[in-house]
């Protein structure tokens, strides 16, 4: 539930470099960068900006979710550690 709540607050920035068939989706939690997804097609004739954004975001969402699990897991582990004195 915590990861889903965090994912609901992720903001997205998109890039489509001019002259390419590449699209990038960048995920941010506040000002903290989480992940980037990328999509591209071989043929410029087949390039569709909307599909590029969709596929790049899908990839970035998976990476962002994985990063949040990693960070939340670390935060939990750190809160449970007892340092030897």
Predicted feature locations:
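Domain-level marker for long, solvent-exposed, non-transmembrane regions
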Residues: 1-85
């Amino acid at each position: 539930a915590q990861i889903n709540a965090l994912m609901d607050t992720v903001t997205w920035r998109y890039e489509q470099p001019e002259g390419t068939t590449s699209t990038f989706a960048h995920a941010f939690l506040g000002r903290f960068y989480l992940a980037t997804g990328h999509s591209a097609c071989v043929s410029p004739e087949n390039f569709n900006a909307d599909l590029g954004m969709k596929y790049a975001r899908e990839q970035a969402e998976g990476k962002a979710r994985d990063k949040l699990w990693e960070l939340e897991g670390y935060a939990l582990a750190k809160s449970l550690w007892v340092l030897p004195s």
